[in-house]
């Protein structure tokens, strides 16, 4: 029994949900519009501003897809009403970020600046050259873009330099200790 899949999704008043062709749903709200094509064997209903997802049987595949579809629909409703945001912090001497022509340009200690194309449906803001705020309506796209940037220079364990999520704990290691000389 999928506990996630059986939960109903409450739809805010500002959000409009449209189910077409038994396997296509579009969710539109104040922040934008998202569309999703789900498995045709699932049944999705939208009654009285409440979305429910039902599966036809208890096959293992259907149980998996049931919970996943419900979670994706919930994220779509939240995304078009409130939106999603991830904040990254750049730590390191002379490490900085800037935006130029829909490109995020990062100076991360390499011999050249690294430029990353910003997707059309994301909004990226750089604060004080060391903080990157990524906003969007698609949770997966926001998380993917943030992870792609963190991967460029992961926080290293000795000084903590690199790109990290705000609030992320980076475990620090002790450096080499000086060699002790022994007197006999």
Curated annotation (Swiss-Prot):
Subunit structure: Part of the 50S ribosomal subunit.
Superkingdom, taxonomy of origin: Bacteria
Protein name: Large ribosomal subunit protein uL6
Annotated disulfide bonds: none
InterPro entries reported for this sequence: Ribosomal_uL6-like, Ribosomal_uL6-like_a/b-dom_sf, Ribosomal_uL6_a/b-dom, Ribosomal_uL6_bac-type, Ribosomal_uL6_CS
Species of provenance: Onion yellows phytoplasma (strain OY-M)
Database matches in SUPFAM superfamilies: Ribosomal protein L6
GO cellular component assignments: cytosolic large ribosomal subunit
GO molecular function terms attached to this record: rRNA binding; structural constituent of ribosome
Gene (UniProt): rplF
Family: Belongs to the universal ribosomal protein uL6 family.
Pfam families in the cross-refs: Ribosomal_L6 (PF00347)
Protein's GO biological process: cytoplasmic translation
Annotated keywords: Ribonucleoprotein, Ribosomal protein, RNA-binding, rRNA-binding
Ranges in a coiled coil: none
Listed Gene3D superfamilies: Ribosomal protein L6, alpha-beta domain (3.90.930.12)
Reported function: This protein binds to the 23S rRNA, and is important in its secondary structure. It is located near the subunit interface in the base of the L7/L12 stalk, and near the tRNA binding site of the peptidyltransferase center.
Lineage: Bacteria, Bacillati, Mycoplasmatota, Mollicutes, Acholeplasmatales
């Amino acid at each position: 029994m999928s506990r996630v899949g059986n939960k109903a999704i409450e739809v805010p008043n500002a959000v409009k949900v449209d189910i077409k062709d038994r396997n296509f749903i579009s969710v539109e709200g104040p922040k934008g519009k998202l569309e999703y094509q789900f498995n045709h064997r699932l049944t999705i209903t939208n009654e009285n501003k409440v979305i429910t997802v039902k599966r036809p049987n208890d096959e293992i595949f259907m149980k998996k897809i049931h919970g996943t579809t419900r979670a994706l629909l919930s994220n779509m409703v939240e995304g078009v009403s409130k939106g999603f945001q991830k904040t990254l912090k750049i730590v390191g001497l002379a490490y900085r970020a800037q935006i130029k022509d829909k490109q995020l340009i990062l100076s991360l200690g390499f011999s050249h600046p690294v430029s990353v194309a910003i997707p059309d449906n994301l909004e990226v803001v750089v604060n004080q050259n060391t903080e990157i705020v990524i906003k969007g309506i698609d949770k997966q796209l926001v998380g993917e873009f943030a992870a792609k940037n963190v991967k460029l220079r992961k926080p290293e364990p000795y000084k903590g330099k690199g790109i990290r999520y705000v609030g992320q704990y980076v475990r620090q290691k002790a450096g080499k200790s000086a060699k002790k000389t022994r007197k006999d």
